[in-house]
Amino acid sequence: MITTNALTKSYNQVPVVRDVSLRCEPGTITGFLGANGAGKSTTLKMIVGLVRPDRGTATIEGRSFVELPNPTRVVGMLLDASAMHPGRSGRSTLTIAARMADVDTRRVEYLLDLVGIADAAEKRVGTYSLGMRQRLGIAQALVGAPQALILDEPANGLDPEGIAWMRTLLRDFADHGGTVLLSSHLLHEVQATADHLVVISDGAVVAAGRLDHLLASSTIVVRSPDPVALAAALHAARIDYVAGPGDALTVDASGGRVTAEVLAGVARDHQVLLTELRQSETNGLEQLFFSLTAAKAASPQEAAA
């Protein structure tokens, strides 16, 4: 299990991660999504002890990373495949990792076969394509037969066949009781792979839960002949929205606080006529992601523009 509680980090007094709490259960794959600069990588680095949080805690199997006697046996991680020594061979890279983890080096041959780079095992990592380095990085994460995996953009450089292979590997790992936390910018791949989802925007979690629940009618479309008045009413009620198709506004309903009944009440209280109020038809994770991470609470004038 991987958990964080109110993780917070600032650089030069600028917050980059704000009170991030998440829980990744054994037997599940959790997708960690956010735009570039949203705080994903910093959060992952805090979980594995590479960055010290200003506040908050992170644990893996009930312990902080620095308290784990042999971390590689508990959690495997791939944060930057390009960081591997370019002058070593693939086999040498894994052999060193196995020895550091106090693992039988015979496991190296199994992992080379598992990730599909046995034929290139004697080649220097510096000659590997990005996809091959990603495969090697995944093998390195698995060296200690860990209970959890933390992967930052593991599909980078993989071709469609490689992505399908990775999906199968992670699903098998989770089905055997492992915990997987992965970040990715490939939304369709996260939708095909993950069971749970955590979305971060501007350093803060904006949605978390089972993927199928979050995708089920996660937004509400509302429209009025007077979009400026409608936007002002939502703004006054502290309800975030983004401009939708035409003059419609789209409201995030994934958290359960905002419902169609609530929106109808806001319109009634502000004497705004509504001509449309409906759950939107989800177009999958892409629509959900952009509705959650788009600029929130725009001014009424911006919404009407």
Predicted regions and their residues:
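C-terminal coupling/interaction segments
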Residues: 255-305
